[in-house]
Structure formats: C-alpha cells, structure tokens
C-alpha cells in the first residue's frame, strides 16, 4: 500500500501531465513544426497555448483573451532555424485597425535559440499602433544588428514606422540577404515573387554588422504593448512560406 504522501505526489504528477497535454505545446502548420510558448512578451499578458489553434482549413488562429481572470496572449516559433531567403505570411483580419495596445509580430528572432542577446539578430514586420505612441503609425519594419553589434540601449539598427490601409487579407513578405532586406505588404493573397497590389515596400541596405547573418527561428505572436486591450483580439494566419536564397 502506498503511503499517503507518496500517493498524493503521484496523483499530482498525473494531474500535471493531463493538464499540459490537453493543449499541444508543439503544432504542425504550413509544413513546419512550431513550438507554442508561454512567453512574457513585455510582461503584460503571458502567452497561453490554448490561444493557438489550427482550423479545418489549415489556418492558424491567434488570440488575446482572458483566462481565469487574467489576460493572455499568443506566441509560437519554428523548431528549426531558417537563413537568407524569402519569408511570406498571408494574414486575415483588419490588422491595420486593431486595439491600440495590440501587436501582431511576424519575425525572425535569435535569443529564443540562444543566438546572441536581446536586441540582436531580429527582423520584424509588425502591425500595431503601439498604444498611440508613434503618431498615426499602424505598422513597422524593423532590423536589429548581428551578433556582437548590439546598439546602445537595445535600439534597432533601422526601422520604419508608417500608416497604411489595406483590406481584410494581407500578404506580408521579407526578402533577407547578407547586406539587404526588402519588406513588402500587399493586398490579398499573392504568390512569392509577385508584386501585385503593393501597399508598402521598403528596402534596407547596410553592412553585415547591421543585418543578422545567422539562421534564426521564425516567430509569430499576438501580444499586448504596455496595457491590455478593451476586448478580445483575434488574428488568422492563413499560411507561411519560406524559400531559401
């Protein structure tokens, strides 16, 4: 017969296994494996795997919502690292007019795989009004420097904050090489290589010090900047594609 304390410990361990297995920590989507996180994302609303799911069409759903009285957000990363090439997401939802505190990030990021420190090895396409702190901006393109070249106070090597309008479906693309990154937003669903219905495009050219040089995980997150939203937020990512250069 098991002693009461030992029996209690076993029951507790079983309950943990059951609770963590009810929602996948790793998902298969767009022909890649993705690790769903419970990251802090600026500390306002932690990620919760229950906020990430894939529907019958194969679309990825992300949410910011309250669970057990606390606001929670969404974040996932590829389990592999990708290098120079073309990265493309098709996004469904009016990402140009979300709650001002909401941020949708489409990015590559090094620290999640222990590549350098924060504010290095990161390339971002972000949709956000940043709590109305950037004039009338609702999106940005941002590049952080390569390993060992962190800018003072963790600032980016380059960024462009801007205001644009688009439809309910947006194709977001970045083309990354050792000395050049081209960012493009397009209305509707566009194939890789197309430049139809361009909303915004910008190219950053610089030295290898200012542009990441190593393969990085790909991340997608929906999170809160400094405060929580006035109501639940949802975004759908229809697809992600990558073509190596």
Q: Which residue stretches match the model-derived regions?
A:
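Aromatic sugar-binding interfaces of carbohydrate-active proteins
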Residues: 117, 162-164, 180-242
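Beta-strand-rich interaction surfaces with strong enrichment in secreted/lumenal proteins
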Residues: 73-80, 156-163, 208
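Bacterial N-terminal signal peptides that target proteins for export
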Residues: 1-9
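Glycine-aromatic-enriched beta-strand/loop faces of beta-sandwich-type recognition domains
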Residues: 114-169, 225
């Amino acid at each position: 017969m098991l002693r009461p304390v030992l029996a209690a410990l076993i029951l507790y361990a079983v309950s943990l296994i059951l609770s963590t297995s009810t929602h996948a920590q790793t998902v298969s989507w767009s022909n890649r494996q993705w690790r769903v996180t419970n990251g802090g994302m600026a500390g306002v609303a932690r990620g919760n795997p229950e906020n990430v799911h894939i529907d019958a069409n194969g679309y990825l759903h992300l949410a910011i919502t309250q669970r057990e009285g606390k606001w929670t957000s969404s974040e996932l990363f590829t389990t592999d690292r990708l290098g120079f090439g073309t990265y493309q997401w098709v996004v469904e939802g009016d990402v140009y007019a979300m709650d001002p505190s909401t941020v949708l990030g489409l990015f590559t990021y090094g620290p999640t795989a222990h590549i350098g420190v924060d504010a290095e090895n990161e390339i971002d396409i972000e949709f956000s009004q940043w709590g109305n702190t950037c004039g009338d901006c609702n999106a940005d393109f941002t590049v952080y420097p390569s390993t060992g070249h962190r800018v003072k106070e963790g600032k980016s090597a380059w960024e462009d904050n801007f205001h644009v309008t688009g439809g309910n479906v947006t194709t977001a693309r970045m083309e990354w090489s050792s000395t050049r990154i081209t960012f493009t937003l397009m209305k509707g669903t566009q194939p890789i290589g197309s430049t139809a219905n361009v909303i915004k495009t910008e190219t950053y050219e610089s030295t290898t010090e200012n542009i990441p040089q190593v393969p990085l995980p790909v991340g997608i997150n929906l999170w809160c900047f400094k405060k929580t939203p006035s109501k639940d937020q949802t975004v759908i990512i229809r697809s992600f594609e990558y073509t190596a250069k």
